[in-house]
């Protein structure tokens, strides 16, 4: 039923390949004239500045289409108030490609408290206000005004995660699919190189875009159900008919899947195939109109959507919007290693477009010496949308391709000092890891390969990553290779050799990891491992740091106000932080970004990880009110005097007044401490001079075990890694990694290179 899969580098090139490769894709008529072009075949519109680097989505898309023989122009950060800028390159021969940029525009522009940000890391000089709210919609409208008959193709992280009816945090309601609101012709979701190349070539051959309804990784707006498909109705919460295949609960791991059986023959793992061919079957989701007023039904719809993300066994989705049908095709087939090498081996200039002059683009400065080695994540964290965008199957580059890029950085990046800032991706240590059983992988519906335990079919051998690190250190001109992507420590402890290699050679003083919480309730809903796993990793980290003769520290990150977190849970986390002498300045308040499971929990106050019924469901406590969200954030920053009044009030309400005072076990001081100066508070023993933010602090005066170091004032050596990094676009649709729903409330929008996650800790796409 679906069109055949063709390797993206084997298509016959379009006739315009004779124009060759442009130093930079043109952004003006003058640049087009210099290249000898009379028109553009494709015009890309993006909310980011144009940086010709594979960490920026439009650079990947532009160079990929150029390699297919098309003439591609870029309109970067246009004035959106009228159509003038959208006509600056003339009428495209084939289509407009529209994206908000590497981040969802709403997350880029607003904090998790819905406050306007005043900076933008993807804009020259970090200037805010250069893109509109809901940029995908606005840009599409202006393209339609400019040239009414030109097809509009949507892509990027904003479009990808809003492809179906979705809860929108900023308007606090369920919105329609962005495809219908934008009145575009087709939407590409996920890593869309394969779909984009097919759309471009079929348009070039004269096919109408309205006929392209069967391309994987696309969503289209139809008048009626397409013919030739069996539609399974899942639009209501009820017991399905007998003929409807219901897969086993993928969120519950059977014993034989989690641990190897002593008698494999006695308890074999069998793959139960669907009774319906995935290629000719679709699942009907509840209509947009029903989801608007039924939160429980929304949780059900979210659950169904997440069950259909496997590119091999997942089925198409159909959803009614008024009198129209939204048709979402199956997920795209992951790129092969050869295709990944092709995409990342395109002739990127690796610098911003010359029109920006000497203006600094923070996102570029953060990733100009980093390398994306893979895509995808099988961690399945509920606050993260990586599975819904990039997929669970890891797409790897070859070691040769990665080493070649290191040499390009050495030769092309101005001011290169010999330090590579990162070799990573959504996570640092999933390179060439995956399921050892192809048949199981093709049929698996589990959202995570590592929760609640590591699947025994998962290959956890880090040999390829270790070999890559060692080879990278041998590249001529490379003096130091750092790892800035978040380490998935539950995987790392399965390979002590990897931890030793990492700690000995690739940590610059601090290593970022994300336990996210300490309490079982929130951790289970986050689908994160318990603190016992963290403790095991910390022991290994400390051991190998000592063996290497280095003083190195872990930087643990935590989320406040995540669905399922009670005031008591946050208090216990605060007490754990105090006991372990951590003081967090970059606090991550939960940010409900589109499509992730945690956002469904936030909106529905129900757990979509389990079967959802009206009378039988698991209710989830959610911190929605501003005051409770402020309290949860304040408890993470228990050391800040500005938060003490709110914490005191909460402790009294909770019957925990004994935690107020100056005794070692107290969380905050009594009220008379508020009147003291910072120097007086330090002298009183509440805060030692050796405190430093969001880092592992040495023992502080006033806390147990402080005698050896009290007042030492010593700090560990700082590493060379920034806590901020932009999204590196592994996605052909405009963003490397999807947003994680945990976001920094400090107002920064600098873009996280390590993960969808939008706004999170100043990092729009961190993955865990």
Swiss-Prot record:
Gene3D superfamilies found in the cross-reference section: tm_1862 like domain
Which residues lie in Polar residues bias regions?
Answer: 719-731
GO MF annotation list: 4 iron, 4 sulfur cluster binding; catalytic activity; iron ion binding
UniProt keywords, alphabetically: 4Fe-4S, Iron, Iron-sulfur, Metal-binding, S-adenosyl-L-methionine
Q: Name one Pfam family in it.
A: Radical_SAM_N
Chain residue ranges for the region called Disordered: 674-768
Q: Where are the transmembrane segments?
A: none
Keyword Acyltransferase assigned: no
Residue span(s) of domain Radical SAM core: 363-640
Q: Which residues of this UniProt protein bind [4Fe-4S] cluster?
A: 377, 381, 384
Keyword set includes Transcription regulation: no
SUPFAM superfamilies per UniProt: Radical SAM enzymes (SSF102114)
Cofactor comment text: Binds 1 [4Fe-4S] cluster. The cluster is coordinated with 3 cysteines and an exchangeable S-adenosyl-L-methionine.
Give the family, as the similarity comment puts it: Belongs to the UPF0313 family.
Task: Return the protein name.
Answer: UPF0313 protein VV1_2212
Q: Species name for this entry?
A: Vibrio vulnificus (strain CMCP6)
């Amino acid at each position: 039923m679906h069109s055949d899969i063709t390797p993206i580098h084997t298509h016959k090139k379009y006739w315009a390949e004779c124009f060759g490769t442009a130093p930079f894709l043109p952004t003006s008529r003058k640049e087009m004239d210099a290249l000898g072009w009379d028109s553009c075949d494709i015009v890309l519109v993006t909310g980011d500045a144009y940086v010709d680097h594979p960490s920026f989505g439009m650079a990947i898309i532009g160079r990929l289409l150029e390699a297919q023989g098309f003439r591609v122009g870029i309109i970067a950060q246009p004035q959106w108030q009228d159509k003038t800028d959208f006509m600056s390159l003339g009428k495209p021969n084939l289509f407009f490609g529209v994206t908000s940029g590497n981040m969802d525009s709403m997350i880029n522009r607003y904090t998790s408290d819905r406050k306007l940000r005043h900076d933008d890391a993807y804009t020259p000089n970090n200037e805010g206000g250069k893109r509109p709210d809901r940029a995908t919609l606005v840009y599409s409208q202006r393209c339609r005004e400019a040239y009414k008959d030109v097809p509009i193709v949507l892509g990027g992280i904003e479009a990808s995660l809003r492809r179906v009816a979705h809860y929108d945090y900023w308007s606090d309601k369920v919105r329609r699919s962005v495809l219908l609101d934008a009145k575009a012709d087709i939407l590409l979701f996920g890593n869309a190189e394969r779909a984009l190349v097919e759309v471009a070539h079929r348009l070039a051959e004269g096919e109408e875009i309205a006929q392209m309804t069967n391309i994987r990784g696309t969503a289209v707006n139809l008048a009626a159900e397409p013919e030739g498909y069996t539609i399974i109705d899942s639009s209501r919460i009820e017991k399905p008919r007998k003929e409807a295949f219901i897969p086993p609960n993928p969120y519950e791991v059977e014993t034989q899947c989690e641990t190897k059986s002593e008698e494999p023959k006695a308890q074999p793992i069998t793959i139960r195939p669907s009774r319906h061919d995935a290629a000719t079957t679709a699942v009907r989701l509840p209509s947009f109109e029903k989801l608007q007023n039924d939160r429980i039904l929304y949780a059900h719809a979210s659950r169904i959507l997440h069950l259909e993300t496997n590119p091999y066994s997942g089925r198409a989705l159909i959803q009614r919007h008024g009198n129209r049908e939204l048709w979402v095709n199956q997920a795209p087939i992951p790129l092969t290693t050869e295709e990944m090498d092709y995409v990342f081996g395109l002739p990127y200039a690796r610098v911003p477009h010359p029109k920006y002059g000497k203006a600094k683009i923070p996102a570029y400065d953060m990733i100009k010496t980093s390398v994306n080695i893979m895509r995808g994540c099988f961690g399945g964290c509920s606050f993260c949308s990586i599975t819904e965008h990039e997929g669970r199957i890891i797409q790897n580059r070859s070691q040769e391709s990665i080493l070649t890029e290191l040499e390009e950085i050495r030769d092309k990046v101005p001011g290169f000092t010999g330090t590579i800032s990162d070799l990573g991706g959504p996570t640092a240590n999933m390179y060439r890891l995956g399921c050892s059983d192809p048949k199981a992988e093709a049929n698996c519906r589990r959202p995570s390969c590592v929760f609640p335990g590591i699947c025994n079919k998962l290959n956890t051998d880090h040999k390829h990553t270790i070999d890559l690190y060692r080879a990278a250190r041998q590249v001529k001109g490379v003096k130091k290779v750092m790892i800035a992507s978040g380490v998935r420590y539950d995987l790392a402890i399965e390979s002590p050799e990897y931890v030793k290699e990492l700690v000995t050679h690739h940590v610059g003083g601090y290593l970022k990891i994300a336990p996210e919480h300490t309490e079982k309730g929130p951790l289970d809903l986050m689908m994160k491992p318990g603190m016992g796993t963290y403790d095991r990793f910390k022991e290994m980290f400390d051991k190998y740091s000592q063996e290497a003769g280095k003083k190195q520290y872990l930087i643990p990150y935590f989320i406040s106000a995540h669905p399922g977190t009670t005031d008591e849970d946050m208090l216990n986390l605060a007490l754990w932080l105090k006991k372990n002498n951590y003081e967090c300045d970059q606090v991550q308040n939960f940010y409900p970004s589109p499509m992730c499971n945690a956002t469904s929990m936030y909106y529905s106050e129900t757990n979509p990880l389990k079967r959802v019924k009206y009378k039988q469901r698991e209710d989830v406590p959610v911190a929605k009110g501003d005051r409770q969200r402020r309290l949860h954030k304040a408890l993470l920053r228990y050391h800040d005097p500005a938060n003490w009044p709110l914490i005191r009030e909460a402790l009294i309400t909770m019957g925990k007044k004994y935690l107020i005072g100056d005794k070692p076990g107290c969380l905050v001081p009594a009220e008379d401490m508020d009147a003291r100066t910072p120097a007086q508070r330090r002298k009183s023993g509440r805060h030692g001079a050796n405190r430093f933010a969001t880092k592992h602090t040495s023992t502080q005066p006033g806390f147990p075990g402080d005698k050896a170091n009290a007042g030492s004032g010593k700090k560990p050596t700082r590493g060379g890694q920034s806590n901020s990094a932009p999204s590196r676009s592994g996605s052909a649709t405009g963003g490397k990694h999807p947003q994680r729903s945990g976001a920094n409330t400090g107002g920064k929008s600098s873009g996280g290179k390590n993960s969808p996650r939008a706004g999170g800790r100043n990092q729009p796409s961190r993955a865990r």
